[in-house]
A protein has these predicted regions:
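Conserved ABC ATPase signature
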Residues: 1, 42-46
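Conserved ABC ATPase "signature" region
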Residues: 9, 13, 20-38
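Conserved catalytic motifs of ABC-family nucleotide-binding domains
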Residues: 63
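Catalytic Walker B motif of ABC-type/P-loop ATPase nucleotide-binding domains
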Residues: 67-70
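Conserved H-loop
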Residues: 94-102
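ABC ATPase "signature
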Residues: 125-126
Length: 154
């Protein structure tokens, strides 16, 4: 039943920050993720999109080098998905972000490198353009279908 700010401060404290440092980190990350206006809202009362932003902010408050996001936009409406994409774009170059998704446009839009798997086996790894080129497909969706329908490397 913690507020947005209390959640962020709690995570910072768990990672060794003093109360003052935790407050400063919370304020900074709330500004980064546009959560400042929601700082006194209870986390459980936030919409799905705001909850995802808070979750990512909580994960980042300890300054990790790698962040894993498993289907972060599943179940979000188009507007919330696009807002979260903007949040993820802000992270580029600051840490390694590993994202799992079933949304092809999300992978194509956000990823520097994409790994297509089929039945747990890596089929291809590269940029969206490289995957399209090596597959001979007209677009990324067609390339994805080629790699996943065949189940073998092209």
């Amino acid at each position: 039943k913690l507020t947005v700010k209390e959640n962020l401060m709690m995570i910072a404290r768990l990672h060794g920050s003093s109360k003052q440092e935790a407050r400063e980190k919370a304020d900074k990350i709330m500004a980064t993720f546009e959560l400042t206006d929601r700082k006194n809202d209870r986390a459980k009362q936030l919409s799905g999109g705001w909850q995802r932003k808070l979750s990512i902010a909580m994960a980042l408050i300890s300054n990790p080098k790698i962040l894993f996001l498993d289907e972060p936009t599943i179940g979000l409406d188009v507007r919330a998905r696009r807002e979260l994409w903007g949040t993820m774009e802000k992270l580029k170059g600051k840490l390694t972000l590993i994202l799992t998704t079933h949304y092809l446009e999300e992978a194509e839009e956000l990823a520097d490198r994409i790994c297509i798997m089929d039945k747990g086996i890596v089929q291809v790894l590269g940029t969206a353009d490289e995957i399209i080129k090596v597959s001979g497909a007209r677009n990324f969706e067609e390339a994805f279908l080629m790699y996943t329908e065949r189940g073998t490397e092209l």
